Amino acid sequence: MDTLILNGYDLTLQDVYDVAYDGRKVEIAADAYARLAKGREIMQELSKGGKAIYGFNRGVGQNKDVTIDEDFMETQNRMMLRSHSLGLPPFNTDEEVRAMMVIRLNNMLIGASCASDDLANSYRDFLNHGITPRIPRRGAVGEADITTITHIGLAFIGEEDVNYKGEVVSAKEAMEKEGLKPLHLQLKDTHTIMLSNSQGEGTAAILVHEVENLVKMSDRIFCLDYEGLNGNIEPMREDVNELRGLPGQIRCAARCREDLEGSYLYSDNRPEHALQDPLTFRGGFIITGAVEDALDYVKKFLSIQINSPSDNPCIMLDKKDVFVNSNFETTSLVIGVEMLAIALAHLSRAVNYRLIRMCMPEFTHLPRFLAPRNGSAHGYDEVQNVLSCLDAENRYLTTPSSVDFYPMQGSIEDHASNLPLAVTKCRQMVDNLRYLVGMEALFASQAVDLRKSDDNGDYVHLGKGTQKAYDVLRAVVPEMKSNRSVYDDINKAYQLVLEEKFLADGE
């Protein structure tokens, strides 16, 4: 994989994933170093001219009225870094932290932050040498993640532990092994480290990636469920969905048609089917389409934020001046994340309803609870309790957190977004949905097997994509022909979803 050249302006979400998951190397564009130097020059000239500059020659928060002498700046940097590193466990994953770091490195290169070259190089070197700071997940309110991402700075100066080659070691030890030196903090470096929403943005980027793949797998398993039901395929027609015009719906319907290519559902000699199926079947792909529409909203604002500065004050290179601002606000993005959570709750409820219905013989014309025909097993009867539990938790997790905040710092900081918390809740929903989608794969495959076992079951042949999903599951979970631990089946199916085994080749 080629080296990613960062310049502050054109980082993509795919670039973030490449760095976070695959360890893609990064380098800093030459013109970015020039912008960093110009920003420092402007800041120092204005300060020498007597201009009060927040976070540079003045304190931060309620201490904005405290003057900081130039001789005290290095000490102030260390004091502020230590005093603000207050995050609480559990810790973010390595992938999340790497996403945070590449995002913060990128948007500081615009030149609005007064970052030193050494600070930018520290981000680059930690990424390229596989040294990952341990960032606590809790403690930030999303109005710049000042109490959590400051732990990155402590790692840079060698004062905290890091994840390195599968072990937790001191940052100093990891740097020594990689031939790196601790960062010497200069000018406004600590303020640059802390005045960023990179925890919320980095975790949101990972969330987007996970949801994109979950939706694809959910659509494929939904189609397999549709085959288990012997459902009416008409709602998936291209012309019908184009008539409505919703982008997510159109994409998901097209994906379902592709997965069902060659399916018996398109055959003229299949058994009689219902004229109209329940909405969670008839419009299942429309519900995942709504998830994709919410994703589009999140990606729009996230892509803007990872390529723009959140620094306060910000240096305007063309104006040769510094301006206070509130560009670290993440309200638009957090509203998108909470909208995504609501969309995922709709998906959760739809899966739940589908699986409860699949246990009803009057609906499926298959044995009750999809039990083997010999009547010797309970099938999936008690799984409904697990489904309902997970769905109830998902409903609870949709409760907005972005409007829960308190005035702080003498009421100067009287607004917040709780973006990191909103993302954390949404990612828990994703993990719950992995179980739900895995259980839908179990139900769907069992329904297909039961339909094949009918006296006239030769008509059952699966689609191009659904056959792959069926084969992936049956490679680890055999057909239920008698009582066995469904607990094991559920966890095996979950693992397949977690490892994204149900995705098509190349996705």
Placement of each model-derived feature along the sequence:
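C-terminal auxiliary extensions adjacent to catalytic cores
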Residues: 2-24, 29-31, 35, 39-42, ...
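Glycine-rich, flexible loop motifs
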Residues: 1-14, 19-50, 75, 80-136, ...
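FAD-binding core of FAD-dependent oxidoreductases
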Residues: 54-76, 83-108, 134-157, 167, ...
